[in-house]
Amino acid sequence: MAVLRVPVSWLLEYVHTQTGFVGETGIRSDTRRTHTDCPVAEDILESLLSVGFEGEILDRPELSGPIVVGRVLDFTEEVHSNGKTIRWCKVRVCAPVQPNNTPLSKDCNPSTQTGNFSNADTNSALETRDIVCGASNFSKGDLVVVTLPGSNLPGGFHVTARKVYGHLSDGMIASEKELGVGDNHDGILRLAEVFQGDELSKIREGDNALELLALTDSAVAVSITPDRGYAMSIRGIAREYALANNIPFSDPLPDDVLPAGGLSIDLRCKPNAFFTLLIQEIENNQTPQWMVRRLQLAGIRSVCPVVDITNYVMVETGQPLHAYDYDAIQGSLCVRTADKKETLDTIDGRRLELHTDDLVVADANGALSLAGVIGGSRSRVTSDTKRILLEAGNFNPIDISLSSRRHKLYTEASARFARSVDILIAQRALARAAELIRDLASGDITELGSAYINYTQQSPILLSTLDIERVVGCCFTREEIMSSLRAIGCDVSCDSDHSTPDTQVMLVTPPSFRPDLVNVQDLAEEVIRVIGFNRIPSLRLSVPHREQPVQSQQYKLENGKLENGYTLSPVTPPRTPPVTFEQRRLLGQSLAACGHVEVICYPFVNLAAAGICHIDVTHNPDSTHNPDSGSDPIIPTGVTRITEPGSSGVSGPDNVDVKEKCSADTSVEHPTTRAISLHNPIDATEGYLRRSLIPGLLQCAHRNLSRGLCDLSIFEIGRVFLGQLRTSNLIGCNSDSTCNACSRKNTIESMNEVYQPYTVSVLQTGSAIQKQPYTEGRKYDLADVFDSARQIARGLGVDFHFVQDKHPAFHPGRCAKVICKHHHIGYTGQILPTLANKHNLPDNVFACEINLDLVAQLGCSQEIVKTLPTSPAATQHLTLTLGNNIAAASVISVVKEGAGELLEDIRLIDEYKHEESDKKSLTFAMRFRDKEKTLTAQRVNLAKENAVRLASSKFGAIMRR
């Protein structure tokens, strides 16, 4: 969000304030606070906030007290023992005048006596002050700024009469830095350096230096959203301030434009508008102090009169201007795209290697400026420039934004063009700048120039009172609506052809400076913004009941055996509320207590990220590329390998490189979950809503690794946005790469088509345990991310188990579905190394993502309290030798079935692969317990033998003794 610095005095030039209450008639119906002829900064911010603009006070006057103009009558130089040379000066100043017209004494206390420090009275007494000064850049007769005892300077410095170098200094001669008007502290401020000619001759001793140097002004910072480019100017903010207070607005732009022609411009790439004007006989010497001060408050450094005027008009009107040294232009001007390997030396000393998509203004010798961004040094205006070619253009906002980002150049001009500038003000802003150059730099305005504009008026929008009621939620009369829209510059007329007795229809044409007004919703927002948000009644929230269009997968079991491996059948979970805020909060606390760090990422991603990492519970494994995944990958405890009927499992060469194995197609996108694009994204490169939290976590990990934080275990809890088959008409969104107009009739129904579940995602990379003396370090591995999934299950009060699967964002063979109550709710595993490398991350990055709303619909957080066991347990180890292609989770399931109810717990504690055979040995820790009585060795051995017998019949397993 951009910030505009607005000097208060500059803003108030364009509005007509009145003493007392601002008029209550017209648009606003709420009671406004009192505004005087000169509203303070707080009043301005309050008014702007009422029409949707936030801000804060930036610069307050820090100078106070008797700060006046003095004339140096005489001085004596003295060299002291420390080698420093000082000047013992006699300075004539105007003494403060009391109400009885008698001067204050030299030792008066300004805090107890009031004084008028202006030179409004010719009877004011002039007196001479003795002042010690360490500067030497002034002469006898110079006018200087004197801070008398009792004045306060920036930084909390209080001026008093004190003894310095053996003399009583009755005040201080101030420098630029001490007054806050510059950075020069080497010498004092001489008014002859600030004012010239008639302005200097009118200054008298005793004049109020604060008013003379415009040091009593303050500035406010106003935040400008990307859709309100018109507000990036004093003119735009003044219009909003006048709107908020129902007072007249005075436009600073002239109505008459200057005739110009005869200059040939080759417009190979047609801009929206392009005007030029030749001005000659310029005296580019000194900028008036009032303009320097205003630019300073607006955050712009003074350069020279011509450049300052172009900057001044840009801040005033929002139209960027550029001045070329006309004598430096070779041949005719041309607006074109940059040539391959073309370079531009900019006015700030950089050399840019231009891209062929960059728009430039060039002459016969090459580029003169990067259009809409920055000028070049070859045609820059200097103090010796006598003839300038003034340019006011209007360019495509996207082109300017891309050029600015491409070269990392964020200028005042590019900030305005990227937000769209009113096409119709280019020529008027040019005329405004020409008038200022004529008045302040003695420029001679010629009729030589060029003019081009390509403007198409926005199409009218049909708006009814019913539309406003449907969007806003309350009723307004047609007169209120029309008055509100006219107040923001719209052309509004009644449309009797479409009106009915119940609904009155209007035809609304937005003004040229509001290209953001394109539909009914935009107009409704403006109506309520102008009328006042306090007119919206407070009502109890009513949520319509509807079935959530959620699909899942159910895994069926018959008689303790898998039916056709695992048979997938879509089901719709029962309608229950989604995961609550309290559940999300407790889950976050649980993960944080386990050592994970919570992060919050933006919900906006590019299309590639939206397609790659989508965690789809309806994902079809057959829709992805199935590369050779190598021999038996390591799968943690509880992961069941799933094979197609008739398949013998996973096969492939063992010597294939890991990255070669991981070349899965990452562009697969399920048709039921198209990415939802935004009409007006904050970042043009990230114009889609996320369908997974993993892309944001990958970017977060990259930022942390680039700053030296290499050991990460981070998580996020947030919404993802899953579109349905039909194109969504959600306000501001559309569910395809093309932008469709929003439907007014079924807005609510369209919003319901977008499934927005809460999900939780964990990402881990780096070291799980740091290497220390007597302790070996350990990297995060696949077991850690499965433990993270189990931590999520414990935080939700449910149990998860895992089924091996494939997903385009995960390593083949190192990915598993997360199953809860026979429903597929997410994925966990190792991120595809090629995908991790694209984010400059190491190969070993592990992640899991789980749909919390699905878990909530299945009934989570149902805690079951079990009776504490009263009988002792018996623990035994079991080692089985079996084929490499048999997953540990399958063995655990069979052993549980064979051992029966006596087996309380089993877990894998060791795995050994035989080098010369296709066999492996799995060692399990088994805990037996009888809830009713103490176990005997015979019963334990019998249960163990039954388990071995069943494992042998199922997998050909052999027990090692």
UniProtKB/Swiss-Prot annotation:
Q: In what residue span(s) does the tRNA-binding domain sit? A: 85-201
Q: Which Pfam families match?
A: B3_4, B5, FDX-ACB, tRNA_synthFbeta
Report the co-factor binding details: Binds 2 magnesium ions per tetramer.
The UniProt record gives the binding positions of Mg(2+) as D516, D522, E525, E526
EC number(s)?
Answer: 6.1.1.20
The name this protein carries in UniProt is: Phenylalanine--tRNA ligase beta subunit
Which species is the source of this protein? Answer: Tropheryma whipplei (strain TW08/27) (Whipple's bacillus)
The record's section on HAMAP family has: Phe_tRNA_synth_beta1
Say if the entry is tagged with keyword Protein transport: no
Q: Which InterPro entries match?
A: aa-tRNA-synth_II/BPL/LPL, B3/B4_tRNA-bd, DNA-bd_dom_put_sf, Fdx_antiC-bd, Fdx_antiC-bd_sf, NA-bd_OB-fold, Phe-tRNA-ligase_IIc_bsu, Phe-tRNA-ligase_IIc_bsu_bact
> Where is the FDX-ACB domain positioned along the sequence?
869-960
Which gene carries the instructions for this protein? pheT
Q: Which residues form the B5 domain?
A: 456-538
GO aspect biological process, one term: phenylalanyl-tRNA aminoacylation
